[in-house]
Swiss-Prot record:
Domain of life: Eukaryota
Source organism (scientific name): Bos taurus (Bovine)
Family designation: Belongs to the peroxin-11 family.
Protein name stated in the entry: Peroxisomal membrane protein 11B
Residues where N6-acetyllysine is found: K43
UniProt-annotated location(s): Peroxisome membrane
Gene name linked to the record: PEX11B
Amino acid sequence: MDAWVRFSAQSQARERLCRAAQYACSLLGHALQKHGASPELQKQIRQLEGHLSLGRKLLRLGNSADALESAKRAVHLSDVVLRFCITVSHLNRALYFACDNVLWAGKSGLAPRVDQEKWAQRSFRYYLFSLIMNLSRDAYEIRLLMEQESSACSRRLKGSGGVSGGIEPGGPGGPGIPGGGLPQVALKLRLRVLLLARVLRGHPPLLLDVVRNACDLFIPLDKLGLWRCGPGIVGLCGLVSSILSILTLICPWLRLKP
C-alpha cells in the first residue's frame, strides 16, 4: 500500500507538471497565432499540446478509484453541507476520470470506434459539476469564517469600546448599522468586502482553493460552449490553476482540508 501511495503521488506530480506544460502550450499557441507566427511553428505547438494531453490521460488511469475512496471518506464528515459538497464533488470527479479513461482508449487506438466528441462532452460536464460543488464548499467555508470573524470582532469592540482592526460592526452576526439609504448600503458592502479580505488573508489554503477552482471553471464552460472564452483565456486560467496545484504539492499545508 505504501508503494502504491508513493507511486500515486509521483504520478500526480507528473500529471500536474504535464498539465501546466499543456496549458502553457495553449497560451503560447494563441500568442503565436495572434502575432502571425509561421504556420509550421503553430502546428508544432498544437501537436505538443496534444501529446501532453494524451500523456496526462495516461497518468490519470486509475484516478476514478482514488476519487471513489475520497468520496467514501467524505461521507463520514460531521458537517452536513461539507459532507454533501465534498462527496458529490468526488463522485463527479470519479465519473470524469472514467470518461477520460475511455477517451484515452479512443485516442491511443485501443478503442478506435469510441465517439470521442460525445465522451469529451460527458467528461467536461462531470468536471463542471465537480467544480461547482468545490466552489459551493468554498463559499460555505467563507461564510462560516466570516461569521466567526464578525462575532470575534463584535466581542473585541464591546471590550474596548472602539473599532478594532479596521472592521466595523455590520457583518454577518454583528450588531448592524442603523439607518438606511445608499450611504449605509455602501458602508455595509465595504465592511463585508474588508471582512472577506481579512478572512481570505488569514486562510491561505482557502484562498488558493477559491482561485484554483475559479480558474478551472473557465475550461469546461468553454469546452461545453456555455461561455466561449477563447484559447488564450483557457490557457492562462489552466496555467495559473496548474501552478497553484503544484504549489499545494510542494507545500502540503496549503491544501484545503478536509
